[in-house]
């Protein structure tokens, strides 16, 4: 019997892609599958999202894995290439690349490639992490437009820094700046991330780039996927391996950081930080057992976690426990732990069995 299982609902993946299309019906879709498809499995997810127009990854290794498994649709490297030595690999595998530094531009100009590559000029409109600044743009695009190793016209993209904060003016300012800077350019444009797709329709350009919403996670604080008709794709579950009577005044686990104030029954579930469940999960973090929410108690161990089933509980070893997913939104769990759902879903270890349904 497998201990920890991440059940991946492929029908939910397709449903969430349909939600994206409903919000941006005139746009082409770049499905973001970086970081092992946000922890959901790169190849199975890409194969499920066959109705996307392209894929985006962060690392060239991810792109090459897709190509080696007969994925032929366009693939965009969101961070671009890291070395001039990568360029022949990009050209040979028909990979598209972001371009955001002078060093990348110089490498493109000097390369000897069998065919030009599709390039996405990444503009810094306010994220201030990657991208060409507005004052650098005229000189940069003059050279990029003349580069023999770039398919012309080149495309343009940017990335939002606060699109999940609807009350902040930053996203509006980024949209306006990007629109102004790119108005004279002929290439295709991409602005909208997950939050942009749902909340900022003015950011819908030729392309949109859904990420976390494809996996049934809300990009906004204090909300859950269902608020936007999204369905959770990952359900992380395990089983009770022991049910024990526990007396008032007794602690449980390393460090004795939880002491029961009543006689109760505790359940031990087969998951821990060795599986990627966060050790920092505090007492009270919700776990779903037999259809009801019970609190995590005691410190998360490498292989086990303890929950308070309550006095007189009839749960037994072998019963299912859900850590997040169907019936227990990952957003709620992340809030309790003090992190973001992105971190939870991307940090599962290889010990967790991936089950696709």
UniProtKB/Swiss-Prot annotation:
The active site is at 34 (proton acceptor), 254 (proton acceptor). Keywords: Isomerase, Pyridoxal phosphate. This is Alanine racemase. Pfam families: Ala_racemase_C (PF00842), Ala_racemase_N (PF01168). It catalyses: L-alanine = D-alanine. Belongs to the alanine racemase family. One of its GO terms (cellular component) is cytosol. It comes from the Bacteria. CDD domains: PLPDE_III_AR_proteobact. GO terms for biological process: D-alanine biosynthetic process. The modification N6-(pyridoxal phosphate)lysine is found at residue 34. It comes from Aeromonas hydrophila subsp. hydrophila (strain ATCC 7966 / DSM 30187 / BCRC 13018 / CCUG 14551 / JCM 1027 / KCTC 2358 / NCIMB 9240 / NCTC 8049). Catalyzes the interconversion of L-alanine and D-alanine. Likely plays an important role in supplying D-alanine, which is an indispensable constituent in the biosynthesis of bacterial cell-wall peptidoglycan. NCBIfam families: alr. GO terms for molecular function: alanine racemase activity; pyridoxal phosphate binding. Pathway: Amino-acid biosynthesis; D-alanine biosynthesis; D-alanine from L-alanine: step 1/1. The keyword Isomerase applies. The keyword Isomerase applies. Its cofactor is pyridoxal 5'-phosphate. InterPro entries: Ala_racemase (IPR000821), Ala_racemase/Decarboxylase_C (IPR009006), Ala_racemase_C (IPR011079), Ala_racemase_N (IPR001608), Ala_racemase_pyridoxalP-BS (IPR020622), PLP-binding_barrel (IPR029066). Substrate binds at residues 129, 302. Its EC number is 5.1.1.1.
């Amino acid at each position: 019997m497998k201990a920890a299982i991440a059940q991946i609902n492929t029908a939910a993946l397709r449903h969430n892609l349909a939600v994206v299309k409903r919000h941006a019906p005139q746009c082409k879709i770049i499905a973001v599958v970086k970081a092992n498809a946000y922890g959901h499995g790169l190849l199975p997810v890409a194969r499920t999202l066959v109705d996307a127009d392209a894929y985006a990854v962060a690392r060239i290794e991810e792109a090459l894995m897709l190509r080696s498994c007969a994925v032929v649709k366009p693939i965009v490297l969101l961070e671009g290439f890291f070395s001039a030595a990568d360029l022949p690999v990009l050209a040979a595998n028909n990979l598209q690349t972001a371009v955001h530094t002078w060093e990348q531009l110089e490498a493109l100009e000097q390369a000897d490639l069998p065919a030009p590559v599709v390039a996405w000029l990444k503009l810094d409109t306010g994220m201030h992490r990657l991208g060409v600044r507005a004052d650098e743009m005229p000189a940069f695009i003059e050279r990029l437009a003349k580069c023999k190793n770039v398919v012309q016209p080149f495309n343009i993209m940017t990335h939002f820094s606060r699109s999940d904060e609807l009350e902040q003016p930053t996203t509006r300012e980024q949209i306006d700046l990007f629109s102004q800077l790119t108005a004279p350019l002929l290439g295709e444009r991409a602005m909208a991330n997950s939050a942009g797709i749902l909340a900022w329709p003015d950011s819908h350009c030729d392309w949109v780039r859904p990420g976390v919403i494809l996996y049934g996670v809300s990009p906004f604080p204090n909300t859950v996927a269902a608020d936007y008709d999204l369905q959770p794709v990952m359900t992380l579950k395990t089983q009770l391996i022991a049910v024990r009577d526990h007396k008032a005044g007794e602690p449980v686990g390393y460090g004795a950081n939880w002491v029961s104030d009543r006689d109760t029954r505790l359940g031990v579930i087969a998951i821990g930080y060795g599986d990627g469940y966060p050790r920092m999960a505090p007492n009270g973090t919700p776990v779903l057992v037999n259809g009801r929410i019970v609190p995590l108690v005691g410190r998360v161990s490498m292989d086990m976690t303890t929950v308070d089933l309550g006095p007189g509980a009839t749960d037994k070893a072998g019963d299912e426990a859900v850590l997040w997913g169907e019936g227990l939104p990952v957003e709620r769990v992340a809030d309790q732990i003090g992190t973001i759902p992105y971190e939870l879903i991307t940090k599962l270890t290889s010990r967790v069995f991936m089950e696709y349904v």
